[in-house]
Design a protein with these regions (language model features):
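Activation segment/activation loop of eukaryotic-type protein kinase catalytic domains
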Residues: 202-256
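Protein kinase catalytic-loop region centered on the HRD/HxD motif
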Residues: 186-197
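Helical subdomain adjoining the active site within ATP-dependent kinase catalytic cores
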Residues: 1-29, 33, 114-122, 127-130, ...
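Conserved structural core of kinase catalytic domains
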Residues: 121-176, 234-241, 246
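Glycine-rich ATP phosphate-binding loop
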Residues: 63-90, 156
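Conserved end of the kinase activation segment
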Residues: 255-270
Length: 385
């Protein structure tokens, strides 16, 4: 393991990473960390460095909401905490496994923060808050990405969902929306290359930061967040099934929301790609998917016979609407290249990453990464205004 960490030849590291698909996960993880070390600051591999003490935080908040506070370790640092709830017996093997996954994620996010294309925040470590009730929670602690001036305005964080819905914010021009889409697609590809799943992409997990007094900001500097369910793509890893949630389910692949499969289907990269496709629809229309859903239900109600009882609109019906009519509406707004990239995310990705008897899961996933880079990342790079 130490020999791999010390390896400095990027080509050799890439070979080891590929071999790690079939060999032990630890080899692949070590090669990934070493590859990041070649272009970033040293990774704090010590668990003690990453397990942050509760007493050093100014406050922690009373619920599971994303929380901005200060962390003191020699100097005062403005931080953002994202919480993950867990119901695991203390001092159990299961808890050790779970915390190790959180620590691996913290290492990855710390190492990748110096690589702009990852679009992730610098993760300082994790906080295991066993005092929280009714269940324990673990927090991923991120450094706020803007310098804090004691006399300047405070840093404000807002989401892509806020950005689209806030009336006081001007709609970004077309070139900025192209750049936003391109940055998000590239970030997801980099996450795939690091052999991780995100599992919770949605507009509330795309963050922006500003120190402007009026709270305005640019949309071209997004940060991926919301790694509640994130894990490495190894089948040996502990996995948490996302709970049913009306907002999040609008971004999830139909197989992840159907009652017959949502609790049993193994997670695949194509599910993250599908979620990106929904984000690209929102960026293209500059309209949140929950607003689109509300309008869709209103259309159905209006079309129903007057005085009749309107049946609930199933999610599957809305998902078909997103993949058809909403995608078709993009060509006028964003052009053919952008629209085809969205089509890949919502349609072609399922075929490229499908599990068929002739294609192993590993080979299918690798093919998907290659096609995603070619048909989405590279194509979005061609979009200009």
């Amino acid at each position: 393991m130490q020999a791999i960490i010390a390896e400095s030849d990027p080509n050799r590291l890439l070979e080891i990473q590929r071999a790690g698909v079939h060999w032990r996960k630890a080899i692949s993880v070590a090669a990934s960390v070493a590859a990041l070390q070649q272009v970033s600051t040293p990774v704090p591999l010590s668990t003690n460095q990453l397990m942050l003490p509760r007493a050093r935080f100014a406050s922690l908040g009373q619920d599971m909401a994303r929380y901005q506070t200060q962390y003191t370790h020699g100097e005062v640092t403005e931080v953002l905490i994202e919480w993950r709830a867990y119901k695991i017996p203390p001092n159990s093997e299961t808890k050790i496994t779970y915390l190790n996954t959180c620590l691996d994620l913290a290492r990855l996010l710390h190492a990748s923060q110096n690589l702009e294309t990852y679009r992730t925040l610098d993760c300082l470590g994790i906080l295991d808050d066993v005092e929280f009730q009714p269940h324990s929670r673990v927090g991923l602690v991120y450094r706020v990405p803007l310098a804090i001036s004691p006399t300047g305005p405070p840093v404000k964080v807002f989401t892509l969902h806020d950005f689209i819905n806030r009336k006081e914010l001007a709609r970004p021009p077309l070139d900025e929306r192209f750049e936003l889409a391109r940055n998000l697609a590239t970030a997801l590809h980099r996450l795939f290359a690091s052999r991780w799943y995100h599992k919770n992409l949605n507009s509330k997990n795309i963050l922006f930061f500003t120190q402007a007094v009026d709270g305005t900001g640019s949309c071209i500097q997004p940060y991926l967040s919301g790694f509640d369910y994130a894990r490495p793509d190894s089948p040996d890893e502990m996995t948490l099934k996302p709970e049913a949630d009306e907002f999040c389910d609008r971004y999830r692949h139909p197989q992840c929301t159907h009652p017959d499969s949502r609790s049993t289907i193994p997670f695949r990269r194509r599910f993250d790609v599908y979620s990106l496709g929904i984000l690209l629809i929102e960026i293209g229309r500059w309209e949140t998917v929950d607003r689109i859903h509300k309008d869709y239900i209103a259309q159905k109600a209006k079309a129903a016979a007057k005085g009749s009882v309107v049946a609930p609109v199933p999610l599957e019906s809305f998902q078909r609407y997103l993949r058809t009519r909403c995608v078709e509406s993009l060509a006028f707004r964003m052009g053919t290249i952008y629209t085809n990239a969205v089509k890949f995310c919502l349609h072609d990705a399922t075929e490229a990453g499908g599990d068929t008897p002739a294609v192993s899961v590993v080979d299918g996933e690798q093919e998907l990464i290659s096609r995603f880079n070619r048909d989405v990342v590279a194509e979005l790079a061609k979009c200009t205004a």
